[in-house]
Design a protein with these regions (language model features):
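Inter-lobe coupling/hinge segments of SF2-like helicase ATPases
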Residues: 1-189, 249, 276
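C-terminal accessory region of SF2 helicases/translocases
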Residues: 168-172, 180-276
Length: 276
C-alpha cells in the first residue's frame, strides 16, 4: 500500500470507507504482552460517594488514578460535572494524597511539569479533562473515574479507558453517569460490555451513522435512503465483488461506451438520492 492509517477506534466514516472498498482492513485483536483487560463498570452518579470511597482505598494501596471531567467550569445550562465543581470536591475529599489539575488552560510548561510528576509517581491523583485522551503512558496508573460519562462519545470513552491498564496490574475504569438518553444508554452499554476497539468502532458506526462518504461529515445519517451499511453489509460485499469481476472482464471496443453509460447512470442515481 501507499499509505498506512492506524487507529485504536476508527470514526464511523473511516470504518464505512473500509466497507466500500476504499481501504483494506487489518485488525490487531490481541493485547500487548503482559497487559490485561480493564475492568469496566457503569455506575449512576447517586453512587458517587461509594465510588470515591473505593478510589480512596485504591490510593491507600499505593495506586495512581485519573478523574476525568467533560468541563472545566460549572455551567448553568449543562447539567454535568466539572473540574471547578466536583473535581475540586474530589481533591478535598482525597487531600491525603497529592493531586493536580490538568486541562487546556494550564500553561504548556506547567502541563509538562505535572505530567512528569504524575509519571514519576509524585502525583497520585490527576483531575483532568480529555487532554489525557491520547499520548499519555503511565503504567502505574490503574484507576480511571469518568464523571458525566453520558457526555462522551463511545470512541472517546474507549480512548480514555486506554490510559489505564498499560502495566501488568489489574486496572479499573468507572463511568459515572447522570440521566441517560436512549442513545447514551446504548453507548455506555457497549462500553461496559467490550474492551475491543473494533467492536467499539462498529457500535459507534451503528449508533451514529457513517456520515457523508463523498463529503466532509464524519458521522450521521448517510445520503442513501434505502440500504443500511450495518444491517445490509452482505449486499454491499456482494455488489462490490460483482462490480470488480465485471470491470476485470471488460474487453474490446464496447468497453468504453459501457463504462460511460454506467457512469452517467450512477451520477443520475446519486443526484436523485441526494435530493438534487
Amino acid at each position: 500500500p501507499d499509505m498506512l492509517v492506524m487507529t485504536a477506534t476508527p470514526i464511523p466514516r473511516s470504518l464505512a470507507l473500509t466497507a466500500y472498498g476504499d481501504l483494506s482492513l487489518s485488525v490487531i485483536d490481541e493485547l500487548p504482552p503482559g497487559r490485561r483487560e480493564v475492568v469496566t463498570r457503569v455506575v449512576p452518579q447517586d453512587r458517587r460517594d461509594s465510588v470515591y470511597g473505593w478510589l480512596a482505598e485504591r490510593l491507600e494501596k499505593g495506586g495512581q488514578a485519573y478523574a476525568v471531567f467533560p468541563m472545566i467550569d460549572e455551567s448553568s445550562e449543562l447539567r454535568c460535572a466539572s473540574i471547578s465543581g466536583q473535581g475540586e470536591t474530589l481533591r478535598r475529599l482525597l487531600s491525603k494524597w497529592p493531586s493536580e489539575i490538568l486541562h487546556g488552560r494550564v500553561e504548556a510548561e506547567d502541563r509538562e511539569r505535572i505530567m512528569e510528576s504524575f509519571a514519576a509517581g509524585e502525583i497520585r491523583l490527576l483531575v483532568a479533562t480529555t487532554i489525557v485522551e491520547v499520548g499519555v503512558d503511565v503504567p502505574e496508573a490503574t484507576v480511571m473515574v469518568i464523571e458525566s460519562a453520558e457526555r462522551f462519545g463511545l470512541a472517546q470513552l474507549h480512548q480514555l479507558r486506554g490510559r489505564v491498564g498499560r502495566g501488568g496490574e489489574r486496572s479499573y475504569c468507572v463511568a459515572l453517569h447522570g440521566q441517560l438518553t436512549e442513545e447514551a444508554e446504548r453507548r455506555l452499554g457497549v462500553f461496559a460490555e467490550s474492551n475491543d476497539g473494533f467492536r467499539i468502532a462498529e457500535a459507534d458506526l451503528e449508533i451514529r451513522g457513517p456520515g457523508d462518504l463523498l463529503g466532509k461529515r464524519q458521522a450521521g445519517e448517510p445520503l442513501f435512503r434505502v440500504a443500511n451499511i450495518v444491517t445490509d453489509r452482505m449486499w454491499l460485499d456482494r455488489s462490490r465483488a460483482d462490480a470488480k469481476e465485471l470491470l476485470e472482464n471488460l474487453e474490446g471496443e464496447g468497453a468504453q461506451p459501457f463504462m460511460q453509460r454506467m457512469e452517467r447512470k450512477a451520477r443520475g442515481q446519486y443526484q436523485r438520492l441526494a435530493g438534487g
